[in-house]
A protein has these predicted regions:
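Asp-based, Mg2+/Mn2+-dependent phosphohydrolase catalytic module
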Residues: 1-3, 94-97, 110-216
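N-terminal helical cap/lid subdomain that shapes the substrate entry/recognition surface
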Residues: 2-99
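Short glycine/serine/threonine-biased micro-segments
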Residues: 9, 42, 102, 131, ...
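Residues at secondary-structure transition points
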Residues: 15, 38, 42, 46, ...
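Hydrophobic beta-strand core positions in alpha/beta domains
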Residues: 104-105, 182
């Protein structure tokens, strides 16, 4: 068993990707835009210039930062009362804690939103470190946010699990040198990430079972 585990947040810990897609669609409909099928996959787990390019591509706006800020503010408003957990999250966190694995969240979301979601969901006490990639120059699929998280945990990346739901996130975890586990949400695993060594689980409960069995 590894000594550290680094969790993505949206779509992995919390069932929030559907909320974000709902908000993006509402903003699109208000502008008379129909989002293509690829939007959910492209927008997931991106930040920085990559995020801006996706917003411009689908919304044809000259102010992608302003639109993203509006989406985030609406998400904050809706998540203040309740943050839905993905099945198996509590069981996995309890298991890792019982086995003295140190835990971090590493998300592309702004730090205030990460902390708010952890607090509202009552998951905050589980985590030793909370890392945001929102201000990094290089976002996923670059490994920077996970390398930062491993450094904050004072562990080599090779002694950490990364748990992700998106292709970009998985590629970032693999590039960081972590044992990377994908639990798909909107994105299905590709042959590329399988060939690069990503582990695929259908749920967080399966992650726990396979760690317990010594597979990871």
């Amino acid at each position: 068993m590894k000594k550290g585990a680094i969790f993505d947040m949206d779509g992995l810990m919390f069932d929030t990707e559907r909320l974000y897609q709902t908000i993006w669609n509402e903003f699109a409909q208000a502008r008379g835009i129909t989002l293509g099928e690829g939007f959910a996959r492209e927008i997931g787990d991106t930040s920085g210039d990559l995020l801006r390019s996706v917003i411009v591509k689908y919304y044809h706006t000259e102010d992608p930062d302003g639109l993203f800020a509006q989406v985030l503010e609406e998400a904050r408003r809706r998540l203040r009362q309740s943050v839905p957990l993905k099945p198996g999250l509590s069981e996995l966190l309890d298991y890792l804690r019982e086995n003295h694995v140190t835990l971090a969240v590493a998300s592309s979301s702004p730090i205030d939103l990460i902390r708010s979601n952890l607090r509202v969901s009552e998951c905050e006490p589980y985590f030793d470190q909370v890392i945001s990639g929102h201000g990094l120059k290089r976002c996923k699929p670059f490994p920077d946010v996970f390398l930062n998280a491993a450094e904050e945990l004072r562990l080599p990346p090779a002694d950490c699990y990364v748990l992700e739901d998106s292709i970009n996130g998985v590629l970032a975890g693999l590039a960081a040198g972590c044992t990377t586990i994908m639990v798909p949400d909107y994105s299905e695993p590709t042959q590329e990430i399988i060939e690069k060594g990503a582990k695929i689980c259908s749920s967080l409960l399966e992650v726990r079972e396979r760690i317990e069995q010594g597979e990871f």
